[in-house]
Amino acid sequence: MIVEPKFRGFICTTSHPIGCKKNVENQIEYVKENGKIEGAKRVLVLGASTGYGLASAIVASEACDAEVLGVSFEREAKGKRTASAGWYNIESLKKFVEGEGKKFISVNGDAFSNEVKSEVIDLIKENMGKVDLVIYSLAAPKRKDPVSGEVYSSCLKTVGAPFTSKTLDFHTGEIQNITINPATEEEIEGTRKVMGGEDWMLWIEALKEANVLENGVKTIAYSYIGPEVTYPIYREGTIGRAKNDLEKTAGEITKVLKSLNGEGYISVNKALVTQASSAIPIVSLYISILYKVMKEKGTHEGCIEQIYRMFKELYEGNLNLDSENRIRIDDLEMAEDVQKAIEEIWPQITSENVFELSDAEDFKKEFFKLFGFGLEGVDYSEDVDITTV
């Protein structure tokens, strides 16, 4: 069938298999051009199908020549409904890696569940022995507590007071004012349960108990801080509370891994166009301005550039750590000259000048690329088989 983008709000409900494959190939090409990294050899990536998790799986496999086990929860094609972009991404990467004669194991299931943890541990024992790097990059709207069975939902709200600011509807290019209401205590706790560090710790404890962690193992979870203009909705909001919990967990994990000389890290990454960030009010406008400023300065990076740099710094003993022991790969975003330029543009921006003062057009293009649309070298008028890549 011919696949075109279809939308429900900020969610694209279709994905293009050949476009997703091309997107993965472009990232692989970047890694190959930039050379090998002497690092991890057996890697578990939790949340391996999109964004930073996908980039981590690609860098591990292609730069480090590591064996990779990737866990994700994606939708296969059914009837005339395409598979999710993440499903095509993982299939594309798996085919490519196996074509090179390397090992890539994929598990499609709920990483929050005990069942998937057990399945992954068995697969590590059978195929890899032990892992020396665990990447935690899960993003989900809900999580079922494996002990109590209670289902928790995450939400995107402020804490304490409502917050009004401007945001970008990137479909129309309109700048609108938006008010975000504060969360209840229950919503704050629900978001922490889904997006905090609890499940990361459960994974590390389960892997350690099963004796599948290598001596000197490292584990990294991804976070974001950003500038003050986004604080009320992000860092000081429900998501920020969950990220604080995630960051606190890194230190606790280092203690758990002490007997293995292991370490738990948080990597604070750059703001990028992802399925998650495009739905966050205010952040979409901030990213559009950020892209323009960083491109003009020649410092713009996407997921793959960020993660390649992080791996290189990690394994060459050159980590840029802050006072709280977090890896700062957001250093170029948070550079004083970049933030100053954004602060000057922010109050001036309107629906009339948004395309001149920001990279709103590119935000839209990058968003479409997440689902395999708008990539060079893909004929979108062709019939495609939606069940494979």
Curated annotation (Swiss-Prot):
GO terms for biological process: fatty acid biosynthetic process. Pathway: Lipid metabolism; fatty acid biosynthesis. Keywords: Fatty acid biosynthesis, Fatty acid metabolism, Lipid biosynthesis, Lipid metabolism, NAD, Oxidoreductase. Its EC number is 1.3.1.44. It is an enzyme of class 1 (oxidoreductase). NAD(+) binds at residues 47-52, 73-74, 110-111, 138-139, 243, 272-274. One of its GO terms (molecular function) is trans-2-enoyl-CoA reductase (NADH) activity. InterPro entries: Eno_Rdtase_FAD-bd_dom (IPR024906), Enoyl-CoA_Rdtase_cat_dom (IPR024910), FabV-like_NADH_b (IPR050048), NAD(P)-bd_dom_sf (IPR036291), Trans-2-enoyl-CoA_reductase (IPR010758). Substrate binds at residue 224. The record marks 74 as: Plays an important role in discriminating NADH against NADPH. The keyword Lipid biosynthesis applies. The active site is at residue 234. Involved in the fatty acid synthesis (FAS II). Catalyzes the reduction of a carbon-carbon double bond in an enoyl moiety that is covalently linked to a coenzyme A (CoA). HAMAP family: FabV_reductase. Monomer. Belongs to the TER reductase family. This is Trans-2-enoyl-CoA reductase [NADH]. It comes from Clostridium perfringens (strain 13 / Type A).
